[in-house]
């Protein structure tokens, strides 16, 4: 407006406004000039003060089908006039778009992990890659970056505060145990846990954070249903799986849980005999034994997931359930028992590297089908208490994050060149610290999103 004042001062009308004709003509011409200059100045100022449009946020062409429970929503807001760029806001109330936090890339993170193999006592020896002599450390310096938004780093103090007087249970196989150990390592940087319970083999355990009255547990249930692997102390050659009976190790405790992370996994690929209504109905990989029908692992996996999801979806159950998807392995040139190895030192990038094995693709397809079937049916009557924790894509991009040969200390010590390929590799579980730590970032965001939706 200072420029308008300067223009106004430069045009002064002298003498009596209605004097002579010559004076009136001068007044008229000066008035016209005055208003023209004001118009031009106004146009100039408005044009140069207009805010540029905020760029449109890209939508993910590879995103999953619409989630009936809204689990992958991270909200984004448009930039304000004072903002230099489009700002991603987690937990915003002004939702303008949804971001699929499960699609993205691993980006360099020089800050590294929250904990180390020295500061955490909960790392099992076969996942303590640095202690076992792994020479590279670059696999520790990456973080997960969703394609269209930012993901907050896990805040252990805030998490413990939010979980005050709560119980979180992990149910599944050794990958679930791997996950809970990662979470323990992060949380123990704030407060060390009390050991409350463990079974004979330390596969099922319960811990407590005393200052927060927060209980954390892991329940060993690799099939999620009743499975018989021993009889009178002698292991079966084939595992007997009851496809219509949930495992009471977790169902008997279920009423206590506030949050549950549950998942299936690789155990369904083992040789198994199927029981339904206490009768043998078929098998997987039974190779013609006793003339049983080969039904395959996909048959059993679908049956079990359907039974599990129906149970946790029952309206009288209070627990909020995070259904975690399958974890791909990264064995190359063989499997765990046939010389397979994983010696990569860098992540893959989205869309350019890394393909899931056919069995992993099939299992993931079944997981998504059964999840959407259950949640869609459930929402017809009420809000779903089940959300998806889709760690498959992000895990596929991390072939560098496994123990590989470093599941034991100094695995190549004393070996000659021709014997190096005889060292057994672990290309399924994850080093601690390692990529699995980022699963907790996703887990927390999914939990927070669900809580926000319940309040709306």
UniProtKB/Swiss-Prot annotation:
Gene Ontology MF term list: O-acetyltransferase activity
Gene Ontology CC entries for this record: membrane
Keywords from the UniProt entry: Membrane, Signal-anchor, Transmembrane, Transmembrane helix
UniProt short sequence motif DCXHWCLPGXXDXWN motif, positions renumbered to this chain: 426-440
Keyword Iron-sulfur appears in the UniProt entry: no
Origin superkingdom: Eukaryota
Compartment(s): Membrane
Presence of keyword Transmembrane: yes
Motif GDS motif per UniProt: ranges: 172-174
Membrane topology label: Single-pass type II membrane protein
Regions crossing the membrane: 26-42
InterPro entries referenced in this protein's UniProt entry, alphabetically: TBL (IPR029962), TBL_C (IPR026057), TBL_N (IPR025846)
Pfam families assigned: PC-Esterase, PMR5N
Known role: May be involved in the O-acetylation of mannan. May act as a bridging protein that binds pectin and other cell wall polysaccharides. Probably involved in maintaining esterification of pectins.
Further remarks about this protein from its record: Contains 2 motifs that are conserved in esterases, but it is unlikely that this protein belongs to the catalytically active pectin esterases.
Family of the protein in this entry: Belongs to the PC-esterase family. TBL subfamily.
Listed name of the protein: Protein trichome birefringence-like 25
Lineage: Eukaryota, Viridiplantae, Streptophyta, Embryophyta, Tracheophyta
């Amino acid at each position: 407006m200072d420029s308008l004042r300067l223009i106004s001062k430069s045009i002064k009308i002298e003498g009596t406004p209605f004097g002579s004709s010559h004076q009136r003509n001068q007044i008229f011409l000066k008035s016209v000039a005055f208003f023209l200059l004001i118009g031009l100045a106004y146009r100039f100022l408005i044009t140069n003060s207009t805010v540029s449009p905020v760029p449109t946020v890209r939508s993910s062409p590879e995103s999953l089908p619409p989630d009936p429970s809204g689990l992958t929503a991270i909200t984004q807001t448009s930039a304000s006039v004072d903002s230099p760029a489009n700002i991603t806001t987690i937990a915003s109330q002004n939702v303008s778009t949804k971001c699929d936090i499960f699609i993205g890339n691993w980006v360099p993170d020089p800050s590294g992990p929250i904990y180390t193999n020295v500061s955490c006592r909960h790392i099992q020896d076969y996942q303590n890659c640095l202690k076992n002599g792994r020479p590279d450390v670059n696999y520790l310096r990456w973080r997960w970056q969703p394609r269209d938004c930012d993901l907050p780093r896990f805040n252990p103090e805030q998490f413990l505060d939010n979980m005050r007087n709560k119980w979180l249970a992990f149910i599944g196989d050794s990958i679930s145990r791997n996950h809970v150990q990662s979470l323990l390592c992060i949380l123990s940087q704030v407060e060390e846990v009390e050991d409350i319970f463990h079974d004979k083999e330390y596969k099922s355990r319960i811990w407590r954070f005393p200052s927060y009255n927060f209980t954390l547990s892991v329940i060993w249930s690799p099939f999620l249903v009743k499975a018989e692997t021993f009889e009178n102390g002698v292991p079966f050659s084939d595992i007997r799986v009851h496809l219509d009976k949930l495992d009471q190790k977790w169902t008997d405790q279920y009423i206590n849980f506030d949050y549950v992370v549950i998942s299936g996994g690789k155990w369904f690929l083992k040789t198994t005999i199927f029981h339904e209504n206490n009768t043998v109905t078929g098998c997987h990989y039974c190779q013609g034994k006793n003339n049983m029908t080969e039904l395959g692992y996909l048959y059993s996996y679908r049956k079990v997931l359907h039974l599990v999801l129906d149970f946790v979806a029952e309206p009288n159950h209070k627990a909020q359930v995070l259904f975690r998807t399958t974890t791909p392995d990264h064995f190359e040139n063989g499997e765990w028992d046939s010389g397979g190895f994983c010696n990569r030192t860098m992540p893959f990038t989205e869309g350019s590297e890394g393909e899931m094995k056919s069995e992993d693709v099939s299992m993931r397809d079944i997981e998504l089908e059964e999840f959407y079937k259950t949640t869609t049916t459930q929402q017809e009557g009420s809000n779903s208490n089940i959300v998806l924790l889709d760690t498959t894509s992000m895990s596929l991009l991390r072939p560098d994050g496994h123990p590989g040969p470093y599941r034991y200390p100094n695995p190549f010590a004393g070996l000659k060149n021709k014997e190096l390929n005889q060292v057994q590799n672990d290309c399924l579980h994850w080093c601690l610290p390692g990529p699995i730590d980022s699963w907790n970032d996703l887990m927390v965001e999914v939990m927070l999103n669900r809580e926000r939706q319940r309040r709306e």
